[in-house]
Curated annotation (Swiss-Prot):
The gene is dps. Pfam families: Ferritin. It comes from Saccharolobus solfataricus (strain ATCC 35092 / DSM 1617 / JCM 11322 / P2). It is found in: Cytoplasm, Nucleoid. The keyword Iron applies. Homododecamer. The 12 identical subunits form a hollow sphere into which the mineral iron core of up to 300 Fe(3+) can be deposited. Its EC number is 1.16.-.-. GO terms for biological process: intracellular iron ion homeostasis. GO terms for molecular function: ferric iron binding; ferroxidase activity; heme binding; iron ion binding. This is DNA protection during starvation protein. Belongs to the Dps family. GO terms for cellular component: cytosol; nucleoid.
Amino acid sequence: MQEKPQEPKVVGVEILEKSGLDIKKLVDKLVKATAAEFTTYYYYTILRMHLTGMEGEGLKEIAEDARLEDRLHFELMTQRIYELGGGLPRDIRQLADISACSDAYLPENWKDPKEILKVLLEAEQCAIRTWKEVCDMTYGKDPRTYDLAQRILQEEIEHEAWFLELLYGRPSGHFRRSSPGNAPYSKK
């Protein structure tokens, strides 16, 4: 009977454990946060399609920016999860079930763009809380994950500001991206 090969020593993980970081807990948090980015991308696709009429049509590009940037966040952090020895669930239904944020369902009154904006805002606020927790968990212990998480956090804060501006007429400093999904902080 042949012995199973020994797992390789991963210095990049070993140094994080020596700094006091619980890798298993971190990977679990990252998988849930990354699942939220993926499900948000999916739901934002549906929400964007329902931004119709004179008022809704102007909101589509902003929703599209947030949607594409969330997909980029998913791709960016997935790489880190695997570097840390983790992985994503093999079943997409399981991925959706473990999401750190609730589903961004299309509201019943979807013909009112403000109702869709409220759903978008709630999703961004959950993402902000989630990525802040990752930043707190990794600050001073895991510079790579911290860097990725804080870049994602900056974009989620921008998304929140956009939706607050649109819902409440609050100044946000929103600027038009050079192209939809051109994430200034987390692009690869």
